[in-house]
């Protein structure tokens, strides 16, 4: 029997509640498909600060690096807003990504038929949307040097540097090409090559890699047009490849096509390391401990972990099918509630998902 080591990071707010739901479903689906998941719970974020004074204990990072996959729930709490920036819960996530050498962020956006009315766009625009945003995580303007604020010519000036090396572009492009090959074979690379030298390099490197993926259709789109097309005609996209800044913006725009951030999973990947899988939503401290949380993004993140991180594709499909079945049956948590549907709390939704398996 195959064994997989999975680190669970419940984190803060609603994190422990949605982690409990995901764990029970993972245990059930692993038994059905004949593999074993060995779970290791670790601290991160505010819960780690409370326990040991640091948002990312060394023991947590060591455990994550030694695992086969990491499943994170949520990080953050306003209780820690008065701390120095480098001591806040969110720093734990940044340190985890850096320590695990994760450079590729994957954000799938897929319209669930039962929730098509939740989107602010017309059904005929978003019906059938199934796209993946692949965002580079460790380069670009967020990390480029030099950066800072200085006094110059009698006034204050702020500056940042947008920079990418050819190797940085190549490794994220390879992730996107591989995904496009597994999906529908269409890759759209997003840049601003008409005005930015760094984007011209980006486009050149993508074009240089394209011949090795002759089965993938490659196109390029300026970021401003991509932002417009995501709203105008999102079905045209399969895999979107972006740099750090553009991906940060476009992935959030794409997320809202679904109408609820409570349904969106994500993955962060490196070259030779475990993947980190987490919901897009935050820790929602205002509803923590009240059995109101929507666990579905966490469950779908667990499905991504099974498919991408552990190569258990049939088990992943079972989890995704359970989510579809429950929604089609009219069960909803409060954030998705609509007329004619049945309201469930977090634990009851977990039970419904378990039954749907």
From Swiss-Prot:
Q: What does this protein do?
A: Catalyzes the oxidation of 3-carboxy-2-hydroxy-4-methylpentanoate (3-isopropylmalate) to 3-carboxy-4-methyl-2-oxopentanoate. The product decarboxylates to 4-methyl-2 oxopentanoate.
Per the record, the pathway is: Amino-acid biosynthesis; L-leucine biosynthesis; L-leucine from 3-methyl-2-oxobutanoate: step 3/4
Full protein name: 3-isopropylmalate dehydrogenase
Family statement drawn from the similarity comment of this UniProt entry: Belongs to the isocitrate and isopropylmalate dehydrogenases family. LeuB type 1 subfamily.
What is the annotated quaternary arrangement, including any partners?
Homodimer.
Q: Which UniProt keywords apply?
A: Amino-acid biosynthesis, Branched-chain amino acid biosynthesis, Cytoplasm, Leucine biosynthesis, Magnesium, Manganese, Metal-binding, NAD, Oxidoreductase
As to how many cofactors bind and how, the note says: Binds 1 Mg(2+) or Mn(2+) ion per subunit.
Q: What is its EC number?
A: 1.1.1.85
Gene Ontology terms describing biological process: L-leucine biosynthetic process
- Which residues participate in substrate binding? 97, 107, 135, 224
Taken from the UniProt record, the cysteine pairs bridged by disulfide bonds within this chain are none
Q: Which cofactor does it need?
A: Mg(2+); Mn(2+)
One GO molecular-function entry: NAD binding
**What highest taxon heads this organism's lineage?**
Bacteria
């Amino acid at each position: 029997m195959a064994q997989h080591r999975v680190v669970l990071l419940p984190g803060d707010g609603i994190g422990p509640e949605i982690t409990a739901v995901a764990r029970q479903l993972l245990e059930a689906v692993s038994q059905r498909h004949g593999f074993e998941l060995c779970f290791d719970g670790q601290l991160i974020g505010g819960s780690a600060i409370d326990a040991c004074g640091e948002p990312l204990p060394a023991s947590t990072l060591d455990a994550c690096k030694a695992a086969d996959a990491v499943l994170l729930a949520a990080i953050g709490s306003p209780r820690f807003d008065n701390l120095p920036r480098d001591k806040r819960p969110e720093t734990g996530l940044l340190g985890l990504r850096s320590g695990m050498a994760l450079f590729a962020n994957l954000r799938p956006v897929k319209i669930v038929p039962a929730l098509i009315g939740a989107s602010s766009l017309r059904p005929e625009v978003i019906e059938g949307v199934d796209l993946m945003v692949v965002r580079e995580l460790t380069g670009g303007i967020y990390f480029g040097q030099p950066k800072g604020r200085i006094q110059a010519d009698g006034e204050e000036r702020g500056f940042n540097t947008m920079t990418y090396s050819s190797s940085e572009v190549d490794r994220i492009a390879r992730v996107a090409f591989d995904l496009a090959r597994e999906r529908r074979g269409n890759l759209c690379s997003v840049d601003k090559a008409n005005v930015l030298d760094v984007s011209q390099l980006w486009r050149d490197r993508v074009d240089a890699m394209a011949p090795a993926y002759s089965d993938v259709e490659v196109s390029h789109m300026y970021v401003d047009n991509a932002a417009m097309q995501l709203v105008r005609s999102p079905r045209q996209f399969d895999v979107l490849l972006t740099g750090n800044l553009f991906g940060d913006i476009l992935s959030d725009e794409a997320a809202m096509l679904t109408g609820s951030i409570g349904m969106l999973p994500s993955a962060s990947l490196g070259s030779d390391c475990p993947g980190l899988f987490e919901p897009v939503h935050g820790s929602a401290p205002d509803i923590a401990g009240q059995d109101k949380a929507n666990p579905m993004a966490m469950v779908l993140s667990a499905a991504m972990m099974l498919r991408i991180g552990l190569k258990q594709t049939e088990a992943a499909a079972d989890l995704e099918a359970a989510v579809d079945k429950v929604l089609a049956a009219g069960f909803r948590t409060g954030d998705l509630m609509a007329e004619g549907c049945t309201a469930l709390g977090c634990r009851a939704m977990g039970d419904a998902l378990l039954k749907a398996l």
